[in-house]
Amino acid sequence: MLSIEKITQLAKENSTPLYIFDKDELADRISSIKRIVGDGVTICYAMKANPFLLDAAKKLNVKFEVCSPGEFSICERENINMSDIVLSGVNKEKHDIEHVMDNCGGVGMYTVESVSQFELLNECAAKRNITIPVPVSYTHLTLPTTSR
């Protein structure tokens, strides 16, 4: 954890307001979570949380949850390994999915929130003759958001 002295020093050396991220604290938290949940669980860092911590998170053996074209673009720019991307979110447009598949092929993971999304992913993958990993979740079957 950053000390008050270090924070004060950074504030004096830089203009304020100032955002300070403790990368060691991030590493400690992720390590702690991994110890608690065990090896069989994959930790995903939500890009929307803070894309400025990508470089630090890349070193922590996590996957990256990407919900928008902008977040995917950041991953591309930062050379995130495409096998570490989980394409998530309810607003995956056809052209966005096609862009990801054209750049990643069957690498990465795609989540599905509806039957229509499944059909769209299937159509895009079939057009490219690729197989994509899609985890099936039974946790939300009774929610209204799971309908077409």
Regions found by a protein language model. Give the residues of each.
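Conserved small/polar residues in nucleotide/adenosyl-binding loops
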Residues: 139-145
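Short beta-strand segments
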Residues: 133-138
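A charged N-terminal "starter" segment
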Residues: 1-132
